């Protein structure tokens, strides 16, 4: 089933190894296939990955976009342990992330980590 994507003016979306930049008007289109897709607003860059949850997200994002779990596995496991130590109360959520990684459902793992990012934003500094 194709994915329907709606983009605002000048919004960006990553499709595989390419970035699509919308023109000055709102648009929608369908994408059919297994290529990884992420909106720019749902990405974390290496430069902005400045918290344990953001570093984990960035690592899983790279697994997803590059379709290469093995390449990032060692980094992922280290970041997961770091986050488990820093946030022991998030064990269930981190367990769900790990299950998604093991099952190959990387986009679902990213969605779980986004919950951590939201909690991290709300936490007092």
PLM region spans:
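Terminal leader/tail segments of proteins
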Residues: 1-125
